[in-house]
């Protein structure tokens, strides 16, 4: 959950699906791995704070043959009338039952994939020599979709340090429990009762990549080798124990004529104060 106060704009753009007649589509028949039907997903966040220049953070996910191949994160700001940009690139290389993610500073995450292209484990080798190991577990529905149910992180080969468990017992209300070292926090993510919104664009939940240890795996989440996006869109998120703060986050969505999710507004309130206001919309 975001604790700092800021106002941001977040854009999802480049959601270019295959043409209706599939002409020119590079997605093979029966690909044997989870497919994303967009050539690019772009998220743009503009952070504004008093006394500091606005910083634009752009995250771009590029796909080929329905698979994520590149991720680029760019920070840009204007100071003294000059535009500054800081860019970090991450690439994904696929092998036999394997996806290798290498970032700008040579942190290497090697995912072992099952026969359907979903990760069952990962070893992350960081530039300072630290090794993080992960295991993943899924709920598989009747349509054969994989929904991430558990991630467990082990440090230096033997110390279980963190985990996230997602309880799908109620499809309208997900219970997400995050454990880091000896602390634990549970979040309740829900959709409107009797008015579920179908996630036709199959965009991952934005808040998942903010939760440690999933924060190390945003590329895998957007690459779908950590499972498929859930069938419905979340409209409310809150800590299970929010009796003191009454903290809640609400999401509203806007769609194009093909029911592709092109706009979302996120509003977090705590102790009666707006903590963040985020709008997601298509670039103009």
What are these model-derived regions, one by one?
Residues 16-17:
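C-terminal motif of bacterial Sec signal peptides marking the signal peptidase cleavage site
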Residues 21-281:
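Buried hydrophobic residues that stabilize the cores of well-folded domains
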Residues 5-13:
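Sec-dependent N-terminal signal peptides
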